[in-house]
């Protein structure tokens, strides 16, 4: 039987007329006609001929509303008609449609395939529509190697890899994840329910998936409604329904996810939901129903329950945008093509208005759905290569297909492939190209509108929405107090910065930080936040609040800023990132002490004035100062009459009107200085800028802050660089916008490590990590130890909820111009105070104290003399950096080619190395640095001051150059080593081997020591055995790696060390920039600087192939000699020592030998073999013994040649090994 084709010209009737449902009798007649007569295919054919593709439309279902079916098909037609039903040159499409929507799709397809006989090579299928039809048709599609384009189903049973269904929408389970995500991110509801009909659409499976998903987010469903879906579409019994409903409503759900189509029980559920007082305000969130518009369903529900419309209560997911979202380029084109189609074919039933898709949102959404299907079909048919067989076409659809429709992307689609291919980025076993879920809500007048923040995307490389990639959200609040102009503006500035760090809502994004504003006023803010926390999920409150709000229970505050001054009291749920008032006062008073200022005055506003005055006085006394006068202002008072013409005045608690008064006073009285708190600068920044811009008084207004300069376009701060990239508008660069950005960056980065997010877990993050570093901002340590007994703190320094570090003193002039210098370099205040004793002693008490003191002094003298003899080896730790939050500058030194020099000059090296140690230790003392350890001839030195460290390294090179070594042998050996290297390396040019002797003597002399310097935070530990401090972590590793790539006589500084120097310090140094250098174990290149300690020296290229023996991240490393002692021939003495150790330790296990040999390695300066593990084996022990023997043997040979009576010692740090002259005789016995 051959099909008859009805050709359609440009002026013919539309390609499909409105089709309505037929009666059952007519349906049987149609089936008979389909088998006895040819099918009429309505098509637009290119008169020039070409390939014709038949598209069988199964985009209909007997169970679906006709308006839904017509809308989808109208959208499909609009796409194809826009190109005159031609998908490519010479490729036309014929759409084959059923005479009636009452014909069973499966039977329609079977009959049509029989009509075509065996000619199926140019055949595609559109649809099917509906879960039951998709299941019935799949076997037929598979048997005939056909693919159903754009099937519309919502069942979880179709979520596996089914290559004969080409889905353009996300899976139903994925759509159900999105409402759950929305509940936590935007709605922030505490009680979330779930509704499904058992046996319908895989409802129980969808519920199980949803339970698993929200448990990952730290939530659970408060209540579940489910009844069995009865056969024949009949609802369950009223008694069963009522019982289930009462249990569900008793949970007081604030939102319910509804996973069901409009069966009687589902409709009854909605009516109960809107009419029951317990649930009448509940949000309804649902995947798209498909069979009927959610708008129609909701309208019918409210009318039946006689309940008015409450907008924004119903939220629905969809797979495509609404037809009116014309900010999307694809939708703009859709509107043009849809309007043209409906204009040309006005007789199309129900859509005689060309703008129908803009007036009926539900129909418009379905038209977009059909239009996208047409666009995908058109792109899939563009290539001619697949047209030889149906199998070839099927395979072509899964060759990593991605369809780009303007700015809408569908795909990737991929077929069978192995795990290796998948790991390399291929999409495998994926027949679902929908990667976007669009959420919309029913607004006023039953119109659908896009939900703000309701667009969730997955990567095209991810086939299904995996719940594991959806991160638990942190839902934060900011507060806009509209009745206070300055606070509202401050909140807006803070939100400008923090909003750049919040989540985009894309699925799989590691950042899940969401922020919402609460609009209120200063009087209602406490009550509204208290009510909100009882009804909604609130993880934390950020930014500007009132002091009263901080006392609300159950809320967590991250870096709160209050308009009135207050002291910090420890509260676990209040985390400060900015300097507290106590920290600011400490830093400012420290500055006053450094400039030897007179006693300051204090003018203060606020309810905590007495306590703040006490805190200021305590701080001043600590630094040897005191208050000259104090004034507490009452409401309405001004500061002008209380400002002295000279001297220092603290003004704590500013009013807006004070700023102009202060500017005028400082401009006129040049000897006056005013100090204010940073929160006043931040909140009133606009007023300060307006008043002090171009004013001479700007240099005399001071404050303390831990922020880098927010408007420095030439900044070296990583934080500010990121801030400027995020906030492009220069006028929005303010202290509060930068503060918001830094706060958001901290949350953004740390959320990646949180598997669950709650207020308590967020607080735990700070106290568990103790010290937190984000970009170049450092916070901590945060401490909360168990030191409170019966409400009394029993230990000092055991609790800290503040963590600002690197607090510097600025003038207002610097705030206005970033090139103005800091008044005081950054410091991390210890908040250790001197507490004077206010109780005077009676004369008798005083006499007793004096007498007792004399006795104590005499006793102390005796004990001191005794200690000089018994504790001479005790270390002096005064100069050791001990502040865990303060940066430490580490210096590593090493003698170049030391092992080769020992082999060449065993007689000279002991004295040379002793001189080396003595000279370096004298410099350590001179520059108040700290000797951490020596390993062999390498030093590890710590310094509190970066400049002192650089000065030490510079003078080290100069002292070695000027020292009289009493021999030229060392220099001759270095030149010989260079020539030997040049013979082996063609590209190597000896820097000193062929230098003129006179020039050489001005630049080089004796031992060549390489030096590496790096500055950063360390893990500082006190060793009870050595009674000294050691420094661990990335900073020590970086310093060691810097030294390891240097050449002898060269001093290298990292970028961090160089930038830690002040501008004045850097001006005193001669430094050459070496550019970015790749260091082993460091993920990114490090910018290096060379300190030209001896001008004129030239060096070989950096030793970038250098490999450290110790490559661990958390251990201190020191560089080692250039050559292993394994390569040195053992002398007679060394062989004797090796034999002695092997005989002595031969019966020990390897672990016991390791324990015994390790102290010798440390004290003799013997480096361990490369890549040796933590646990030694027999070979490792033998190698270590050989190295010890080689090192000690050199010394024994030298001293044995001089005298038979002397013992020898290694040159390690203060340790001695005695070797008897009779040792060899003892062994021979």
Curated annotation (Swiss-Prot):
Residue intervals annotated with topology Cytoplasmic: 1-24, 867-1229
Residues bearing carbohydrate: 77, 84, 626, 693, 768
Segments forming domain Guanylate cyclase: 889-1043
Single Gene Ontology MF annotation: metal ion binding
Any matching Pfam family: Peripla_BP_A-cyclase
Record topological domains on the Extracellular side: 46-845
EC number: 4.6.1.1
Compartment annotation: Membrane
Enzyme class per UniProt: lyase
CDD domains: Nucleotidyl_cyc_III
Reaction(s) catalysed by this chain's protein: ATP = 3',5'-cyclic AMP + diphosphate
Residues bound to Mg(2+): 894, 937
GO biological process assignments: cAMP biosynthetic process; intracellular signal transduction
PROSITE patterns from the UniProt entry: GUANYLATE_CYCLASE_2
SMART domains in the record: CYCc
Membrane topology of this protein: Multi-pass membrane protein
Gene Ontology terms: cellular component: membrane
Task of the protein: Could act as a receptor for an unknown ligand.
Name of the protein this chain belongs to: Receptor-type adenylate cyclase GRESAG 4.3
Gene: GRESAG 4.3
């Amino acid at each position: 039987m051959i099909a008859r084709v009805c050709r359609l010209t440009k002026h013919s009737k539309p390609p499909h007329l409105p089709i309505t449902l037929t009666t059952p009798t007519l349906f049987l007649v149609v089936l008979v006609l389909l088998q006895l007569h040819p099918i009429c295919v309505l098509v637009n054919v290119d008169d020039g001929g070409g390939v014709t593709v038949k598209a069988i439309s199964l985009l209909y279902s007997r169970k679906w509303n006709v308006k839904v079916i017509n809308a989808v098909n109208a959208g499909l037609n609009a796409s194809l008609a826009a190109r005159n039903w031609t998908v490519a040159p010479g490729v036309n499409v014929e759409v084959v449609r059923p005479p009636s929507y009452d014909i069973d799709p499966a039977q329609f397809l079977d009959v049509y395939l029989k009509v075509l006989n065996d000619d199926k090579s140019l055949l595609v299928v559109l649809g099917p529509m509906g879960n039951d039809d998709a299941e019935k048709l799949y076997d037929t599609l598979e048997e005939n190697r056909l693919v159903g384009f754009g099937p519309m189903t919502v069942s979880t049973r179709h979520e596996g890899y089914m290559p004969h269904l080409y889905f353009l929408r996300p899976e139903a389970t994925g759509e159900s994840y999105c409402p759950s995500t929305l509940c936590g991110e935007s709605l922030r509801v505490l009680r979330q329910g779930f509704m499904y009909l058992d046996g319908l659409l895989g409802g129980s499976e969808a519920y199980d998936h949803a339970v698993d998903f929200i448990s990952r987010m730290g939530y659970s469903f408060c209540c579940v409604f489910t009844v069995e879906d009865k056969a024949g579409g009949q609802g369950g019994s009223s008694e069963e329904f009522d019982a289930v409903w009462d249990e569900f409503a008793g949970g007081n759900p604030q939102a319910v996810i509804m996973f069901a189509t409009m069966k009687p029980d589902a409709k009854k559920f909605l009516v109960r939901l809107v009419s029951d007082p317990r649930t009448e305000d509940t949000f309804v969130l649902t995947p798209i129903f498909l069979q009927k518009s959610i708008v129609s369903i909701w309208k019918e529900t409210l009318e039946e329950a006689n309940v008015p419309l409450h907008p924004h209560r119903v939220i629905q997911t969809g797979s495509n945008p609404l037809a009116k979202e014309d900010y999307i380029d694809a939708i703009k084109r859709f509107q043009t093509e849809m309007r043209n189609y409906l204009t040309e074919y006005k007789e199309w039933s129900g859509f005689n208005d060309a703008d129908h898709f803009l007036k009926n949102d539900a129909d418009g959404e379905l038209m977009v759905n059909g239009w996208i299907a047409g666009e995908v079909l058109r792109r899939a048919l563009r290539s001619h290569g697949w047209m030889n067989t149906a199998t070839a076409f099927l395979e072509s659809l899964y060759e990593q297909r991605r369809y780009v429709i303007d700015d809408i992307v569908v795909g990737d689609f991929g077929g069978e492939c192995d795990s290796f291919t998948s790991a390399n980025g291929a999409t495998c076993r994926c027949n679902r190209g929908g990667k976007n879920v669009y959420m919309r809500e029913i607004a006023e007048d039953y119109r659908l509108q896009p939900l703000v923040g309701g667009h969730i995307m997955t990567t095209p490389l991810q086939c299904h929405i995996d719940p594991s990639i959806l991160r638990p959200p942190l839902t934060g609040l900011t507060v806009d107090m509209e009745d206070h102009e300055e606070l509202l503006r401050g909140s807006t500035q803070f939100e400008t910065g923090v909003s750049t760090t919040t989540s985009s809502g894309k699925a799989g994004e590691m950042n899940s930080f969401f922020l919402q504003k609460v609009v209120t006023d200063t009087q209602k803010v406490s009550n509204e936040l208290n009510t909100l926390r009882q009804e909604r999920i609130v993880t934390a409150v950020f930014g500007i609040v009132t002091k009263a709000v901080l006392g609300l229970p159950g809320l967590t505050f991250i870096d709160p800023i209050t308009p009135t001054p207050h002291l910090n009291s420890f509260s676990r749920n209040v985390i400060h990132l900015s300097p507290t008032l106590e920290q600011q006062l400490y830093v400012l008073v420290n500055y006053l002490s450094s400039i030897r200022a007179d006693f300051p005055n204090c003018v203060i506003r606020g309810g905590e004035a007495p306590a703040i005055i006490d805190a200021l006085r305590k701080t001043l006394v600590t630094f040897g100062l005191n208050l000259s006068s104090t004034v507490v202002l009452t409401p309405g008072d001004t500061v002008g009459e209380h400002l002295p013409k000279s001297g220092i005045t603290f003004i704590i608690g500013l009013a807006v009107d004070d700023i102009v008064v202060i500017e005028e006073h400082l401009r006129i009285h040049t000897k006056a200085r005013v100090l204010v708190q940073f929160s006043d600068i931040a909140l009133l920044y606009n007023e300060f800028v307006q008043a002090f811009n171009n004013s001479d008084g700007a240099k005399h207004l001071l404050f303390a802050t831990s922020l880098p300069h927010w408007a420095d376009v030439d900044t070296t701060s990583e934080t500010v660089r990121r801030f400027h990239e995020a906030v492009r508008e220069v006028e929005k660069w303010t202290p509060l916008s930068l503060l918001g950005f830094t706060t958001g960056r901290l949350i953004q980065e740390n959320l990646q490590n949180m598997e669950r997010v709650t207020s308590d877990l967020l607080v735990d993050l700070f106290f568990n990590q103790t010290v937190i570093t984000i970009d170049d901002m450092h916070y901590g340590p945060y401490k909360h130890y168990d030191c409170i007994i019966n409400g009394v703190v029993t230990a000092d320094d055991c609790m800290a909820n503040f963590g600002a570090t690197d607090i510097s003193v600025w003038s207002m002039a610097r705030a206005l111009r970033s090139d103005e210098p800091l008044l005081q370099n950054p410091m991390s205040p210890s908040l250790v105070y001197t507490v004077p004793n206010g109780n005077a002693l009676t004369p008798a008490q005083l006499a007793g104290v004096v007498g007792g003191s004399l006795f104590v002094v005499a006793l102390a003298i005796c004990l001191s003399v005794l200690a000089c003899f018994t504790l001479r080896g005790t270390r002096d730790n005064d100069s050791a950096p001990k502040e865990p939050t303060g940066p430490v500058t580490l210096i590593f030194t090493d003698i170049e080619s030391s092992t080769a020099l020992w082999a060449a000059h065993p007689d000279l090296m002991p004295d040379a190395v002793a001189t080396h140690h003595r000279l370096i230790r004298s410099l350590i003392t001179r520059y108040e640095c700290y000797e951490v350890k020596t390993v062999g001839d390498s030093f590890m030195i710590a310094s509190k001051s970066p400049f002192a460290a650089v000065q030490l390294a510079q003078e080290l090179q100069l002292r070695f150059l000027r020292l009289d070594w009493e021999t030229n042998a060392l220099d001759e050996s270095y030149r010989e080593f260079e020539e030997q290297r040049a013979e082996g390396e063609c590209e190597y040019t000896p820097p000193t081997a062929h230098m003129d002797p006179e020039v050489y003597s001005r630049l080089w002399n004796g031992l060549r020591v390489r030096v590496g310097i790096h500055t950063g935070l360390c893990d500082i530990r006190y060793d009870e055995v050595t009674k000294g401090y050691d420094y661990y972590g990335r900073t020590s590793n970086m310093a060691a790696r810097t030294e390891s790539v240097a050449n002898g006589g060269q001093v290298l500084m990292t970028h961090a060390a160089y930038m830690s120097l002040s501008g004045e310090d850097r001006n005193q140094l001669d430094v050459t920039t070496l550019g970015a250098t790749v260091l082993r174990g460091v993920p990114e290149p490090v910018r290096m600087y060379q300190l030209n300690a001896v001008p004129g020296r030239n060096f070989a290229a950096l030793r970038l192939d250098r490999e450290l023996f110790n490559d661990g991240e958390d251990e201190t490393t020191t560089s080692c000699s250039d050559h292993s002692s394994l390569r040195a021939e053992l002398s007679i003495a060394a062989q004797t020592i090796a034999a002695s150790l092997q005989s002595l330790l031969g019966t020990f296990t390897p672990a016991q030998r390791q324990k015994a040999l390790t102290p010798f390695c440390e004290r003799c300066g013997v480096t361990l073999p490369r890549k040796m593990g933590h646990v030694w084996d027999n070979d490792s022990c033998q190698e270590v013994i050989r190295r010890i023997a080689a090192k000690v043997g050199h010394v024994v040979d030298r001293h044995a040649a001089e005298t038979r009576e002397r013992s020898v010692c290694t040159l390690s740090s203060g340790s001695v090994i005695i070797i008897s002259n009779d040792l060899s005789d003892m062994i021979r016995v």
